[in-house]
Amino acid sequence: MDPSFSHIQMVAIDCDETLLRSDNTVSEYTKDVLHRLQEKGIRITLATGRMYQTAKPVGVSLNLGNVPMILFSGGLIQELETAHKVFERTVPRAAVQRILQLAREYDWHIQSYIDDRLLCHHRNWQSDLYEAQTGAKAEFLGDSLYELSQEPNKLIAIDRIENIDRITASLTPLVGDEVTLVRSQKDFLEIIARHVSKGDALEQLARQYGIGMEHIVSFGNAENDISMLSKTGYAVAVDNAVEHAKLVSREVCGHHNDDGVARWIEEHLL
C-alpha cells in the first residue's frame, strides 16, 4: 500500500466504461481486488447513471454485500441487497411536461424512469441500444408516455451526437433552471433534478458514515462523473475518459478494458 493513501476510508466507482468492460463484465481479478479492499475495511459504493434494475446485477456479480449504490447520476441512493431507498429526488413534474411536449413535437427519443421501470414511446434503435448495453427491459407506452402524472427519477434522451447537441441547446433555455442536463455518454443526455449529481449524493452518503470527502477516492470517465471527481479527496479518471474528466482528476489510470480501476487500487490501497 502507498502510505500517502493510508487515510482513505471509501471509494466511489462509476460503472459503465469505468469499472465495466465493453462487454459489460468485470474480470475475476477486479472482483478479487474489490473483495480485498472491503476486507481491509474500506467502504465501496457504485455511482452510476443506471437504475436499480440494471445496477443490481453489477453489484451482485461483485459480491459486495448490501452496499449503497448511487443511481440515476445522484437522483437515488439505494441499498444493493435490501433495495432500501436512502435518498431520492425526482424531476419536477412541470419541467417534465414541457420536456415531453417538446419531445413529442420534434419526435425525440426520450426515456422515463419511474418505480424502477424503463418507459419508452416505441421500440427503435435507441431503445435497442440501451437494452443491449444495460440489460434493462423497456416498456413501450405509445402516446401515454407523454401523459404520465408521476414524477420520474430521470429522463434520458438518446440520439446521434449532433442531435444530442441540438436537444441540449433546445432544453437549456426551456428548463435549465429547473433540471440538470448532463451526459453519461456522448450520445446519452440525462435529465435529472436540479442540484442533483453524483458528487452531491456522495457527500450525503459520506456524512451518513461520518467520512469526510477528503477520505474518499473516486473513479470515473464521463461528464456525469465530474461532480464526484471534483469533490473527493483524490480523483482518478480511466484512460478512456473524456478530456474534462481527466482535467479535474489528480491522476489517469488504465483503460476500463484493462482493469484500470482495480490495478490502481491494488497498487495504492492494498
Where are the predicted features?
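A general structural signal for well-ordered alpha-helical segments in protein cores
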Residues: Y52-A55, V96, I164, G199, ...
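Hydrophobic packing residues within well-ordered alpha-helices of enzyme cores
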Residues: T30, A55-G59, I167, L171, ...
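Conserved acidic, metal-coordinating active-site core of Asp-based
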Residues: L102, Y106-F219, E223, S227-M228, ...
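Short active-site oxyanion
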Residues: G41-T45, G65-V67, K154, E214-H215, ...
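Active-site phosphate-binding/coordination module
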Residues: T25-S127
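Short, structured coil segments at secondary-structure junctions
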Residues: L62-G65, S73, L174-D177, K231-T232, ...
